[in-house]
């Protein structure tokens, strides 16, 4: 039996789950523009109140992947995405964007999926622009960058044009919906390994199980106990690790890796320009909390990508490329590549 928007809404109102295959049907209708804005808003609000299940999220993400413009990476060895949901409210500099250059310098291939700022002071696309990079690369160009340099940035509006269908509804609603947690699940390069930060500890285990349903090989889903959607320096971090088809939860702390606990205020910025300055200081090897948090997150990415034996080993590898300048070299190569591609 087909799942219509009306049936879905009735199911949600009754606090009953929409099964994964039913969610696939529903999302295809929404993405094809077959569901009115009023019904889309009602369904999104209802799912938020009911709380989205693993199957519902996986079904919706499956359809978003179907509709995306894919990036075909030939050599997928050590291919990883470093991504966050955003929305943690802490306004830190672009930690995961900085970490992608570090991870690439240490041997991973990073296919990062991101966008402009929605609630933060600086989105990944915003800081890349002020660093001089062109963010609007086409899928073939992103694949070439990953192959040549080891890093590529996929600007969400280019790879998910169908999102324009629901953008007006989301904008008018002005609240978090399932789409806020779908972005990190819909990497156009289908990276088999992922380091994902989430804004809510309740999402750690959920997103790890969703990634398993979507075919991820390895994943670390993390949320600082302070609400940070990265591995945090300020407190312990809850981790959901997907490996070998199983998910296990545990906690890590900065002290586990020889780092001092440091308040988030040391990482906060007010603009993309301030984020750029902090990012460049890190890539120049300037010691401090900003470098530590990047090394920690890059280390986790290197572990989940299969480059490092564990997070601690990853932190060592990340620190080496930060202090010897290799991470900064990757940034410079990437900026030069994107500018050449943009002006061809």
Swiss-Prot record:
One Pfam family in the UniProt entry: Glycos_transf_3
Residues that, per the record, bind anthranilate 2: 170
Binding residues for anthranilate 1: 84, 115
Molecular function GO terms recorded: anthranilate phosphoribosyltransferase activity; magnesium ion binding
Cofactor(s) needed by this chain: Mg(2+)
GO biological process: L-tryptophan biosynthetic process
Annotated positions binding Mg(2+) 1: 96, 230
Gene Ontology cellular component annotations, sorted alphabetically: cytosol
Cited InterPro entries: Anthranilate_Pribosyl_Tfrase (IPR005940), Glycosyl_Trfase_fam3 (IPR000312), Glycosyl_Trfase_fam3_N_dom (IPR017459), Glycosyl_Trfase_fam3_N_dom_sf (IPR036320), Nuc_phospho_transferase (IPR035902)
Keyword annotations: Amino-acid biosynthesis, Aromatic amino acid biosynthesis, Glycosyltransferase, Magnesium, Metal-binding, Transferase, Tryptophan biosynthesis
Oligomeric form and interacting partners: Homodimer.
Purpose: Catalyzes the transfer of the phosphoribosyl group of 5-phosphorylribose-1-pyrophosphate (PRPP) to anthranilate to yield N-(5'-phosphoribosyl)-anthranilate (PRA).
Protein name: Anthranilate phosphoribosyltransferase
Gene designation per UniProt: trpD
